[in-house]
Amino acid sequence: MTDLTRRYAKACDLADFRDRRLLGVLRDILPERDPVTHVERKVWEFAQLAMSFEDLGLLDHRSRVLGVGAGDERILFWLTNRVGEVAATDIYGSGDFASREAGGSMLTEPSAHAPFAYREDRLEVRWMDARRLEFPDASFDAVYSLSSLEHFGGPGQVDLAAREIARVLRPGGVALLCADVLLRRHPLNAAPVDLAARAVSLGTKRRTAGLRRRSVVAEALTPRELLRHVIEPSGLELMQPLDLSVSPETWDNVCRLYPDGRQEPATGSFFPHLLVQVDRSVLTSVCLPLRRGT
């Protein structure tokens, strides 16, 4: 397995979308969109996955790859045309994403979800909880998960998923994990504050709050939580130092997300869509390239 040729352990940044290789990969994965104008952090995650797997020699039509919380994202169909096998796992048909990218029909008719022709013989789709992966130890050459870890529950549940991802990786295997990271967490968006609000309201508000679990900004991880609940429990090695800095221009179009789902970009234009404000805090995507020791 070869080494990484570029910076992957980083936060999503507007400058990334000026990189010719990244733009070329996005044109291949999403040919119907212009990546120069459709600047979005979710497709950045696709590019990070595709480029890192290419760097590491995994796009060899032999590698066995597991997608955790895979939904029906087009990257899994793209991978079937380039690796030996893709196992897509999710709680299909249940959970918060059942009506979106994790519909139950993915289990019975994945071809209906495919945006382009793919190697159907290389795709296996299974209902599976990320905290209890039903595969033997050391089953996969690579595992990926894109913006899913933070949705698995409280910190203890993320720990379990991280351990399971490491368990099913073969020695020397790679996990490419993307998650929502809080670049700025307001002091009021803290677990003790949410827990106090829950207590004062006699449990009628912020019902999911706990000693270590936020309620208002629950589905994003702080840098410390990435370390404590993803990297350390997995026992995997971060392949590069993590860079969470973003350029000033990336902050120009922070999109405010309201509880009812409304989105309000600072400039009035949806793109670039890289930073999201939830309540008083701001998040984006982060990429973690991890390797299991030999």
Where are these regions (language model features)?
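Class I SAM-dependent methyltransferase Rossmann-like catalytic core
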Residues: 2-59
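Class I SAM-dependent methyltransferase SAM/SAH-binding core
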Residues: 66, 73-132
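A short acidic, Gly/Pro-enriched loop at the edge of an enzyme's catalytic core
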Residues: 128-143
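Conserved beta-strand signature within the Rossmann-like core of class I S-adenosyl-L-methionine
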Residues: 172-180
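Short alpha-helix
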Residues: 213-241
